[in-house]
């Protein structure tokens, strides 16, 4: 029944992944050890998309946990939800990738990858009808970025016709862990463009801004950031996990969201974002939700969509809401801001409704947009990449692991191509497409 196998790689990927499983297991009425005490049929109906039932109402996540060092794994295993995961599905090395993409992709990671693929294969075999994979990782480190992208391409080889969705945390200038992040991120984007079907871009900088501005947290921890990411992941996947009409699996989401195969980098947002203590003091209405959801301050991707245009976007509302009210609101937003949507894709705003609200809220809305302004993210990384690469700074760490400078040049030009493709479609208008055939004919006649 339309299963999804989840992989989490590297420290960031594992922490985000753990938060995601915590969120969705409580939404489906599972306790910390995976025993089911669901109160409604809706919680049970599509449980097997993410969970495998192993007798007497115990459910185990279809999750594969990967890292090149044991630290994060030990933390998850000894954490509150450690007993949820299947012990054989923890695959880890002893060395660490040391924030070096080449180590994750070519040396250390390559030694571990066959072991991981075995576990993935076993998970896939226990599915009735596997729809695809999702992976949580960061693009700035060594394991999540290097080994994460290696896993994606290996899974692509083995399961060429299955969907591949990634939740990728991009490095941000304000919150930098290591100086080589621009290298790691560029090399990763180079891989994601080719091998992933949909990439949800999440940005630490935007998450920090939300925590400090909206949630009024003076010094947000990674726990707070991961809480935000898991909320948005739960919102995106709600249409896979609960009965609904629109975007009910990964492929349908991609069909609605990806007009050109390379342009599959989405920005995500969520509403209502209220600080933990203030939730109970206000009732949300659909107009308020919609307003908040289209507010650039609610985006978890640090680029301003007002600088670009939406090719497509999709909104998932959750809770007891009338479909008509949602449609009216979305229509009015679309009409008021029609300049922000390309006019050559009609009906490019999709809405879905799921009647099960997230824990602790009456209603919520999750936003996924394919906007041309996502090029700002890549631009930021590219500028930093170029500054270092011109001087060949830190390159010896990568060439020492057997990489070639050529690969950096290729990755850089692939990312530049991606940015110019976004730019081209941002500027395209309806009339562009119609003029070209005549222009070609005219040139042809002139030659004769």
Swiss-Prot record:
Alphabetized GO MF terms: GTP binding; GTPase activity; metal ion binding; structural constituent of cytoskeleton
Necessary cofactors: Mg(2+)
GO BP: microtubule cytoskeleton organization; mitotic cell cycle
Subcellular location: Cytoplasm, Cytoskeleton
Major location category of this protein: cytoplasm
GO terms under cellular component: cytoplasm; microtubule
Binding annotation for GTP: 11, 69, 138, 142-144, 204, 226
Keywords: Cytoplasm, Cytoskeleton, GTP-binding, Magnesium, Metal-binding, Microtubule, Nucleotide-binding
Residues engaged in binding Mg(2+): 69
PROSITE patterns hit by this protein: TUBULIN (PS00227), TUBULIN_B_AUTOREG (PS00228)
InterPro entries associated with the record: Beta-tubulin_BS, Beta_tubulin, Tub_FtsZ_C, Tubulin, Tubulin/FtsZ-like_C, Tubulin/FtsZ_2-layer-sand-dom, Tubulin/FtsZ_GTPase_sf, Tubulin_C
Family affiliation: Belongs to the tubulin family.
PANTHER family per record: TUBULIN
Name of the featured protein: Tubulin beta chain
């Amino acid at each position: 029944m339309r299963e999804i196998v989840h992989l989490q790689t590297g420290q960031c990927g594992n922490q985000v992944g753990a938060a995601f499983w915590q969120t969705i297991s409580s939404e489906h009425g599972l306790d910390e050890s995976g025993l089911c005490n669901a109160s409604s049929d809706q919680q049970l109906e599509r449980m097997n998309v993410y969970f495998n039932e192993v007798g007497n109402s115990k459910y185990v996540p279809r999750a594969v946990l990967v890292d090149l060092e044991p630290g994060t794994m030990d933390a998850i295993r000894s954490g509150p939800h450690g007993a949820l995961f299947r012990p054989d599905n923890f695959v880890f090395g002893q060395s660490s990738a040391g924030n070096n993409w080449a180590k994750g992709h070519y040396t250390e990671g390559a030694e571990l990858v066959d072991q991981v693929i075995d576990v993935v294969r076993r998970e896939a075999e226990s599915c009735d009808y596997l729809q695809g994979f999702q992976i949580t990782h960061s693009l700035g480190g060594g394991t999540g970025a290097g080994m994460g992208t290696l896993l994606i391409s290996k899974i692509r080889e083995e399961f060429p016709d299955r969907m591949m969705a990634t939740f990728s945390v991009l490095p941000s200038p304000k919150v930098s862990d290591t100086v080589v992040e621009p290298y790691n991120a560029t090399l990763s984007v180079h891989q994601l463009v080719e091998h992933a079907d949909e990439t949800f871009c999440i940005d630490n900088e935007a998450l920090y801004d939300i925590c400090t501005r909206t949630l009024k947290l003076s010094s947000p921890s990674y726990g707070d950031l991961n809480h935000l990411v898991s909320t948005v992941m739960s919102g995106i996947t709600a249409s896979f996990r609960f009965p609904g009409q629109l975007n009910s699996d990964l492929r349908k989401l991609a069909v609605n969201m990806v007009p050109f195969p390379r342009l599959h980098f989405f920005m995500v947002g969520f509403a209502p974002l209220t600080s933990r203590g203030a939730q109970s003091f206000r009732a949300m209405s659909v107009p308020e939700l919609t307003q908040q959801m289209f507010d650039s301050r609610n985006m978890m991707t640090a680029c301003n969509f007002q600088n670009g245009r939406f090719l497509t976007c999709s909104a998932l509302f959750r809770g007891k809401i009338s479909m008509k009210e949602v449609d009216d609101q979305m229509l009015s937003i679309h009409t008021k801001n029609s300049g922000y949507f390309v006019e050559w894709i009609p009906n490019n705003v999709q809405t879905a409704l799921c009647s099960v609200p997230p824990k602790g809220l009456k209603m919520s809305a999750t936003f996924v947009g394919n906007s041309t302004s996502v090029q700002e993210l890549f631009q930021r990384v590219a500028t930093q990449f170029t500054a270092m690469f011109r001087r060949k700074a830190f390159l010896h760490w990568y060439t020492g692991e057997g990489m070639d400078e050529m690969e950096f040049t290729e990755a850089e030009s692939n990312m530049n191509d991606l940015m110019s493709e976004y730019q081209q479609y941002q500027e395209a208008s309806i009339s562009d497409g119609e003029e070209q055939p005549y222009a070609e004919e005219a040139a042809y006649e002139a030659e004769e």
